[in-house]
Amino acid sequence: MSEDRQGRSTDTGKILYCSFCGKSQHEVRKLIAGPSVFICDECVELCNDIIREELEEKAQSARSSLPKPREILEVLDQYVIGQNRAKRTLAVAVYNHYKRIESRQKNDDVELAKSNILLVGPTGSGKTLLAETLARLLNVPFTMADATTLTEAGYVGEDVENIIQKLLQKCDYDVEKAQQGIVYIDEIDKISRKSENPSITRDVSGEGVQQALLKLIEGTVASVPPQGGRKHPQQEFLQVDTKNILFICGGAFAGLDKVIQARSTDVGSIGFGAKVKSSERKQEVGKVLAEVEPEDLIKFGLIPEFVGRLPVVATLEELDEPALIKILTEPKNAITKQFKKLFEMENVELEFRPDALSAIARKALKRKTGARGLRTIVESVLLDTMYDLPSQENVSKVVVDESVIEHKSEPYLIYQTPAAPEQKAAGAE
């Protein structure tokens, strides 16, 4: 006997039955044949309903697990000091991004546009830490890329596709997970073109990289080799859709404040109605950056198409001395807490006096390294102590004060007083 693909018997008198529900070919509209089995249209519809319900349940659980903007902000506050405006902007943008993914799964009529994020702020102000904390909170794959190493395809350097390669490595090549991850591209200001006008020569690490990043950030299907590189052309490439990957770009944008100030004071610069530019009105860099407009970024050297694909702009302020002291002591993984833990493992208490914390903050401000330089300073003043301590006995406490930071004095070591030997009771032999 032979059957066609619809399950109709080519031999008369032979009735076929659905292998799942047992109904005959006369009781259903369609019977589909498989290898030695049949399935009717009713069972197919039932299977579709089951799958649809499971997908809806999965979407609901994802929605319930997605933290609200206020909850995101509370977690960011535990790790990042200050920068309240930037944290609020990020919390809302990330929440809306993952709501957008949910709406795409439902096939809603209204398609929500992708909102990638641009972080603008001085070095050491917390841009990278914000992105890392977000990824940890949302439990999604996260990778970082350095824009200065990227070049156009075909030139020496990293291709932009390598960014997706790194993201895949973070989630063990699970394409579904990678397609909902977060990518942080640092030093994005370093790929600005050299002048505001389009270049007639090839700029493979500046404007060329911006052009290469356009489709990746907006949403495209990137072909990525499973094991990286192009050494094995016979390998089957993985197809990764980037339309649901959140891209966060960050940069210090040194000199952008001058571009903004030039724009804001450019109106009426000649004649009786001219605004007088006073040198006394020197604003803080952070406050100036908060007034950034897309036109300022274009004038700085980003191409208009690239700026258009980063609609959410969050600016970070320069950290002052009180903020740096808080960074040293308050976050969950504060630097002083980390070193105290290291000393605790040697059964030694570590104390930082308030004047020492102020001195560390002042030194970081002087070096213009922001929060990133705090660890370097603490590491350098405690290096010799950490070298000698494991070999020393009876040390109970190490104290760091201002003189240790400012004058490179040795930290104070407090020793345990040896216990007095027990005296024998009177009359004992």
Curated annotation (Swiss-Prot):
Keywords noted in UniProt: ATP-binding, Chaperone, Metal-binding, Nucleotide-binding, Zinc
Domain ClpX-type ZB: 6-59
One GO term describing the cellular component: HslUV protease complex
GO biological process per UniProt: cell division; proteolysis involved in protein catabolic process
Disulfide bond entries: none
Keyword Zinc-finger in annotation: no
Residues that bind ATP: P122, T123, G124, S125, G126, K127, T128, L129
Alphabetized GO MF terms: ATP binding; ATP hydrolysis activity; ATP-dependent protein folding chaperone; protein dimerization activity; unfolded protein binding; zinc ion binding
Gene3D superfamilies xrefs: 1.10.8.60, ClpX chaperone, C4-type zinc finger domain (6.20.220.10), P-loop containing nucleotide triphosphate hydrolases (3.40.50.300)
InterPro entries: AAA+_ATPase, ATP-dep_Clp_protease_ClpX, ATPase_AAA_core, Clp_ATPase_C, Clp_protease_ATP-bd_su_ClpX, ClpX_bact, P-loop_NTPase, Znf_CppX_C4
Residues passing through the membrane, by range: none
Its job: ATP-dependent specificity component of the Clp protease. It directs the protease to specific substrates. Can perform chaperone functions in the absence of ClpP.
UniProt cross-references to NCBIfam families, sorted A to Z: clpX, PRK05342.1
Subunit comment: Component of the ClpX-ClpP complex. Forms a hexameric ring that, in the presence of ATP, binds to fourteen ClpP subunits assembled into a disk-like structure with a central cavity, resembling the structure of eukaryotic proteasomes.
HAMAP family reported in the protein's UniProt record: ClpX
Protein name as it appears in the record: ATP-dependent Clp protease ATP-binding subunit ClpX
